[in-house]
Amino acid sequence: EIDGRKGTPASCTTPCSPGMTVSTQTPKLERLRRGVMELYISDHPLDCLTCAANGDCELQDMSGAVGLRDVRYGYEGDNHLSLGKDTSNPYFTFDSSKCIVCNRCVRACEEIQGTFALTIEGRGFGSRVAAGFNGNFFDSPCVSCGACVQACPTATLTENTVIELGQPRRTVLTTCAYCGVGCSFKAEMQGETVVRMTPYKNGGANEGHSCVKGRFAWGYANHQDRQLEPMIRESITDEWKKVSFEEAIAFAAGRLQDIQTRHGKYSIGAITSSRCTNEEVFVVQKMVRAAFGNNNVDTCARVCHSPTGFGLSNAFGTSAGTQDFKSVEYADVILLIGANPTDAHPVFASRMKKRLREGAKLIIVDPRKIDLVKTAHIEASGFLQLKPGTNVAVINSLAHVIVTEGLANTAFITERCEPTEYAIWSEFVSRHENSQEAMEAHTGVPAAQVREAARLFATGGNGAIYYGLGVTEHSQGSTMVMGMANLAMATGNLGRDGVGVNPLRGQNNVQGSCDMGSFPHELPGYRHVSDDATRTMFEQLWGTV
């Protein structure tokens, strides 16, 4: 109840305002809530003891909270109790007979995920949640992010693993093992068995959202083929045999020593994974350098990260992106280059789509016509469909427009950049060979589109650049990264929320694995092995002098 207003508005849809006086516990509200719950229960299966959501059902909890002890209405007449289940989705079940049409799932799909796969069809008592055009979940636009399942207060939307295994009994906080977004999850367990993965609401990267990979693609954790004990074999033709960790370590160490004795200290190396933790990667590179005595260590991130590491460190002094993921919520113009976040980084894509629905502009530079060119309630302001391999030509032609039309942020350049270096760069990009007209034949992008995109990025407010493997996994990757950094500096789009140059990593710890010294030419912290002082410091720290 709100003083000065009629009725009893819902708290979840009523904005706060200055001076508002709100009462949440009054006899009138208690009677109203009890009556509403009674009506819900009158059209709801009372199979709580055998329901998959027993003990984890908000309808059950609220019935007890409002003191509902009896239901005056029977099941006579029309009801929804005989509605069937939709089991088409491989990860969760939709039981329409338990739906209270609260609309939470619809709002989650629209406001959080941004897919708009769900709607309420029908009117009045006949209202029901529908996926797609009155079809099932599998045939609808649903991307199985799990937002609807998490939002559901009853057993209407339930994970199949919970139906099969029951409710989890303990929780472990963890990080998703897939893409570079780094979503935080609660692994909900029964003993050592994972029952479900629930996105952690306080996760800095995902803020309680998830994608199909992190939410449901964790079957490997429980799979019978997962090895939980060390095994060894004398030769490739022998059968594997399980042994203790002590025996396995001694066996591996002996074989490695034997190889070095016979073939020299450079005969052994290691490749780290960007799916490993910082601690694991650090120990591997330290073992290679301190124990094996060489720098034969590398990482799978070399393919996707090296151009970013080299380009951004040359431009800004650090190999990391300039912003966190929350920064996109303050962007006014988003320049998306060589990335398809709806497929590769879905949780970040949802945050980006939310900002775009709020009015931010989007410029896409990609050979492919990705989803974000035009999707539900979103249409890119510019789509520069370049020919593969012409990334640098496009970024230079964008810079040409900005410099020659006087759109550069001269105050930012004077205060924060190197004016001498800017003069050299601006003279280069101002040349006719870098103009949008000269580049059109090479890039395939019409000059008018380049001009319009450049003007929008330079004058549209906070401009943020996001890029993916379409930029870095390329022979011109480092040059392109530096080109984007130059564009950000020239327009003053650095040093605050909503701007920056931001790589979208391919795996969950690309940045960390490189920070830990996984490259043969760099020690932890990107300190070069050719520097005498750096080598001396690590030799003393690791006791290898």
Language-model segments: residues:
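Fe-S ferredoxin-like electron-transfer domains
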Residues: 2-144, 149-175, 190-193, 228
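Catalytic alpha/large subunits of respiratory electron-transfer oxidoreductases
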Residues: 45, 163-545
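Short basic, glycine-rich beta-strand/loop surfaces that mediate nucleic-acid
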Residues: 1-2, 138, 317, 395
